Amino acid sequence: MYTIQREEVDGADAMPVLRVEMQGITSGWAQRFLLVSDVHFDSPHCQRDMLRRHLDEAAATGAGILSIGDWFDAMQGKQDPRHTKSDIRPEYKGNNYIDAIVDDAVKFLEPYREHIIGLGDGNHETAISKKLETDLTGRLARRLQVPRLGYSGFVQFRFQRNEHGGRTSVNMYYHHGSGGGGIMTKGTLRVVRQAAWIPDAHILVSGHIHELVRRKLQVYLPV
């Protein structure tokens, strides 16, 4: 199993670090994590049955769950120029749209609360913060009592064999993403650029463009 600790870093440009500690590492040991992005939970296009199956599997295997933004869709408020009547779920057709989607997300995620290691922001949440001055991710994280992360940051996975030593760590940098993905590259060029200025990250992840791409990079550092 694991423990988590969110570390605040001083400085306007500093990013938060979420530390995940794992001990008792032996041969054959394994710890799983479920990384999700762009769920758009309140959209009628969200495949909630599939989402629930993934979360159920994570809970059954003791996996940690990390969301890196756009858990909410939040596009159907009456002040949003993108809203359409066909893209709002029936249960949200009231005069408390924002409250309703937060309440529903809390109810949906409550069974998995103890497995959630962090909830991050996406462009849909930050748009609501700018327009309506309410923090969707913060509200959800507070009610679930789980760590609230930012639009980008670090997750450091720390492994320790026993109390006498045998320590190592893996650094993951996450960024929700921005802009388009590119027809051919599907967002991989942005990751290559990130690898150049974040050389200490062993893993780089991002979402936003709704593409599934995995790529192995080599970064050479001076000794």
Identify the function of each model-found stretch.
Residues 31-41, 169-180:
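Active-site-proximal beta-strand elements of phosphoester/diester hydrolases
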Residues 18-24, 152-165, 217:
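Short acidic-hydrophobic surface loop/beta-edge motif
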Residues 67, 171-223:
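Conserved beta-sheet core of the metallophosphoesterase superfamily
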Residues 14-19, 48-51, 184-194:
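Short, motif-level signal for alpha-helix interfacial/capping segments enriched in acidic residues
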Residues 121, 159, 174-178:
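Short, structured patches in soluble enzyme cores that scaffold and shape functional sites
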Residues 21-22, 26-31, 36, 41-151:
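Core catalytic region of metal-dependent phosphoesterases/phosphodiesterases
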Residues 1-30:
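Short glycine- and acidic-rich boundary segments immediately preceding or forming the N-terminal edge
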Residues 56, 132-145, 164-166, 193-198, ...:
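Short, surface-exposed basic-aromatic patches at helix termini and helix-loop junctions that form
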